[in-house]
Amino acid sequence: MAIYTRTGDAGTTSLFTGQRVSKTHPRVEAYGTLDELNAALSLCACAAADENHRTLLEAIQQQLFWFSAELASDSEQPSPKQRYISSEEISALEAAIDRAMARVEPLHSFILPGRCEAASRLHFARTLARRAERRLVELATEVNVRQVLMRYINRLSDCLYALARAEDSDAHQANIIREVSKRYLAACQPPHSKETTPVALSFHDLHQLTRAAVERAQQLQVPVVVSIVDAHGTETVTWRMPDALLVSSELAPKKAWTAVAMKTATHELSDVVQPGAALYGLESHLQGKVVTFGGGYALWRDGILIGGLGISGGSVEQDMDIAQTAIAAINVGTHQ
């Protein structure tokens, strides 16, 4: 079956109602841009990780067919055989916007359009929706355009922005979980060649670490909380000196756990959680369990992670000083 008619070779096209107009007519520009947008939404639906987003995008694509058909008709009389955009579709877009934006953190500056493939495609589709809106405004200066169509296309670009933010947030959270899991699993699986080496923190190690930390804290006249976890992040010792801040009882174990989970000192995480860095959002995604300022150290022996030490109560520099002094008292290192 031939798909060509040759009737458009002279630069004109036929509307649904039979009139022939130039292919540069504002009406053709408007529904032609909607066609571009519809094609872009197919790419978005293929890339979206969220099943609800895919379902919504496919529904929007069907609605754009109705939208285009209405623009491609010169008649203002509704056809009983045709579907039309209504307030119901606008309400569905607004509900989708609210759901998506409830899942993401507020922004206080401009962002690059998309850090994952799905978000990038959605942002691109958003720009096409904006262009379609401009074409529709231009068309409305020449012919009657239902106000509900103007509202729909305006809301659609907002919806695509919200979906892009949600896809970005989900992808970033998944990356963080993968990275943390990778580091944690690596810490829990020592090389086979080291299996017979006594690598766990002994009672003597725990005693020496705690004693050395307390003695250094007393020298600095800083009451602190000392917390030690094993290689699995399980708390083994926590000692609170008299007059130590109550919040330190929360922070010291978190510092020790973070050091084991991330296999690094907590102060070394500061740069990688900044906006735009690989682990940006790590603290919020793990509900505050991760600490990214000084005072937590991973404890290594013979290249194997054996535990973590967390100190809290003084300034960041004092906490790090106390931890380093305690670590020096036993046969462990702070890096693999």
UniProtKB/Swiss-Prot annotation:
Keywords: ATP-binding, Bacterial microcompartment, Cobalamin biosynthesis, Heme, Iron, Magnesium, Metal-binding, Nucleotide-binding, Transferase. Mg(2+) binds at residues 215, 218. Pfam families: Cob_adeno_trans (PF01923), HbpS-like (PF03928). Disruption phenotype: Decreased growth on 1,2-PD cyanocobalamin medium; no growth is seen in a double cobA-pduO deletion. Residues 194-336 are annotated as: PduOC. Heme binds at residue 207. One of its GO terms (molecular function) is ATP binding. It comes from the Bacteria. Signal peptide: none annotated. Pathway: Polyol metabolism; 1,2-propanediol degradation; Cofactor biosynthesis; adenosylcobalamin biosynthesis. It is found in: Bacterial microcompartment. GO terms for biological process: cobalamin biosynthetic process; propanediol catabolic process. The keyword Ligase does not apply. It is an enzyme of class 2 (transferase). Converts cob(I)alamin to adenosylcobalamin (adenosylcob(III)alamin), the cofactor for propanediol dehydratase. Found in the bacterial microcompartment (BMC) dedicated to 1,2-propanediol (1,2-PD) degradation. For adenosylcobalamin synthesis dATP can replace ATP, but no other nucleotides will substitute. PduS and PduO allow regeneration of the adenosylcobalamin cofactor within the BMC. The 1,2-PD-specific bacterial microcompartment (BMC) concentrates low levels of 1,2-PD catabolic enzymes, concentrates volatile reaction intermediates thus enhancing pathway flux and keeps the level of toxic, mutagenic propionaldehyde low. This is Corrinoid adenosyltransferase PduO. The lineage of its organism: Bacteria, Pseudomonadati, Pseudomonadota, Gammaproteobacteria, Enterobacterales.
